[in-house]
Amino acid sequence: MTTVSDFTAHQTATAVVARKGTAGPRPSAVDAPATLTDEHGDVYVEPGLTPLAAREANRSALVGLLDAAGVGHFAVRGTVDHGTVVGVAEEDRERALQAVFRGLGQYPGHLSVVDPDAPRPAKPVSSRDPRAWREVVGARILQVSWYRTDPGRHLLLGHEYGCALEFWRRQGTCLVAPRANRATWAVAVGGPNVMGAARLFSRFVSDWTPGHLAPALPTRPEFLVNCADDIAFPVDAVYTWVDGNDPAWKQRKAQAKGEVYHAESASDARFISRDELRYSIRSLHLFAPWIRNIYVVTDDQVPAWMREDLPGARIATHREIFRNPEDLPTFNSHSIESQLHHIEGLAEHFLYFNDDMFMGRPVAPHSFFTPNGTARYFPSRNRIPQGAVAETDSPVDAACKNNRALLHERFGKVITQPMEHIPYALRRSAMAEAELEFPEAWARTSASRFRAMTDLSPTSSFALYYAALTGRAQPGSMPFTYIQLAVPDLADRLQRLLDGRDQDSFCLNDAFSTPEDTEAQQELLDDFFTSYFPTPSPYER
């Protein structure tokens, strides 16, 4: 019978050997361990790091140790999306623990004993510390992880991305779980392992997530059920983007005819490219790997850094999506947004991003859609100004007032709030239906080459409220931050956002900026973007 003192002595000895470079199965293909601080302990440097990659590397490392020891195991549908869960029979406890000790001896990591009944989780402890092993022998659940960072030491992905080892107790013909999961309390003793789709084991994963980041896992048949809270439908992402420095685009803009009623409507600040799109797509790669396809809508422009030869992201030009070619060229985002539902191949459920919107941490599709497909919208605390459209209204307020008047005429309801600058969850069918139901207003918006007094705001308000009033959308909420780049304390706000990393999404919105302002802002943004989103997406050259 193995004792706590045996485990402690074993771990201390192997940790010393590991410091000398003993060969053995590594937790993943990473560089040599690098300690960020004494508090963090061993941290492994991994190029191309993402939360999903860290999650899979920890799972793969742990099950590799179990496989090497001949310990049978199965993936469990846990209730936490960041990490993974592996179940083993209680009778295999000693062999499983010895395998874990050997692995952590060769490549030190972190572990914690999980008590499902505790009011708060135990803090992870370095496997080099003998205290980490004191309660392991009788533990019902053990969480194991290897901390990871990117080569620039900007990301630190820790214990929450680890793999939990659950010991399932035999009771009659069943193995019984030590805690609740998403599917079942028990599986059959000696039951077969079957392959389960990766999305069953985390809501951060979809059927379109790359297999090397989220492979199918050996599990039990009891976990293959389609739960009521599963989202299996595809979700796409759509961006509108312009390179305001493109000479050809500048010439088209100079030749465009149309009445510009407000100085802000055609200001250069609206068309400045600060490379936000590159980093916004990085945010999807890092924090929303469940997105199926990314569409970038442009006026025959392609970002210089973007690859077009890979599936999963493509350019959709204005010429492809506009139903009335005479509306082109256009320099009005409202006009372009009115045609997004015409993108060929676009999913019924999609998120519309301005290129200044970003995911801030891992987010599940459930934040934007319910499992039955209902979209979520995010009303602002602000209010739409009273009265009819006036010449003094900003383009945003004028469009909100037009939305309000049209929806009130149709539904007898008065909308009072604009939307927060959070990615807009849209239903393609609702937009198509709105275009058919309000053809004159829709066509008028499409034909406005610059923002006009008569515009609707199709994606950021009108289509969301139309979906809500027809039973296809409901209010939601999420932690988010909105930063106006013109604020005097921009540097401090960006630093707080970077230090906290506690927002589901954020928006860095531009104002009417002078060239001097823009230059200073760009320097701050360059540092911020490379620190917050250090890992390139696959779509970068």
Swiss-Prot record:
GO molecular function per UniProt? transferase activity, transferring phosphorus-containing groups
User: Which InterPro entries does the record cross-reference, listed alphabetically?
Assistant: Stealth, Stealth_CR1, Stealth_CR2, Stealth_CR3, Stealth_CR4
Q: What is one GO biological process annotated to this record?
A: polysaccharide biosynthetic process
Keywords (alphabetical) are: Exopolysaccharide synthesis, Transferase
Q: Which domain of life is it from?
A: Bacteria
Give its E.C. classification number.
2.7.-.-
Q: What class of enzyme is it?
A: transferase
Q: Any keyword Transferase?
A: yes
What's one Pfam family here?
Stealth_CR4
Which family does the entry's similarity section mention? Answer: Belongs to the stealth family.
PANTHER family, per database record? N-ACETYLGLUCOSAMINE-1-PHOSPHOTRANSFERASE SUBUNITS ALPHA_BETA, PTHR24045
Q: What is the additional note?
A: Stealth proteins are part of a protein family that is conserved from bacteria to higher eukaryotes. Family members were first identified in microbes as proteins that help pathogens to elude the host innate immune system. Microbial stealth proteins are involved in the biosynthesis of exopolysaccharides. Stealth proteins are predicted to function as hexose-1-phosphoryltransferases.
Report what the protein is called.
Exopolysaccharide phosphotransferase SCO6021
Q: Organism, per UniProt? A: Streptomyces coelicolor (strain ATCC BAA-471 / A3(2) / M145)
